[in-house]
Amino acid sequence: MNTNEELKDITPVNYWIGKENKISAQHLQNGERIVIVGFGQSMTPILKSGQPVLVEPVTEETKLSKGDVVFTKVNGHYYLHKIISIRNDKSYQIGNNHGHINGWVSRSTIYGKMVKKL
């Protein structure tokens, strides 16, 4: 499938890592796939600063695994970071790609999962 065709129904949303971004979370909670552009070095080399990624909503059926890059809210801040550890399939430890741990979250605060780098 052509990338333009893949993205024709996508909501574009830019976001700064660590800043409040209720709009992105709301789009994902409404079942919309979104494009997020994160900025900063916390996820290099997995993601480069300014690199757009396609994020799909997390539903009850979504499989979440260690290493997945997710859009989540931790301690009042939104991040596009990865799952570091999983406890009992209910709690997820979120951190960046350089060893910094943001904290533990429940599945209900993981709004989206990165499915493709653009």
Where are these regions (language model features)?
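Extended hydrophobic leader/signal-anchor segments used for secretion and membrane insertion
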Residues: M1-L118
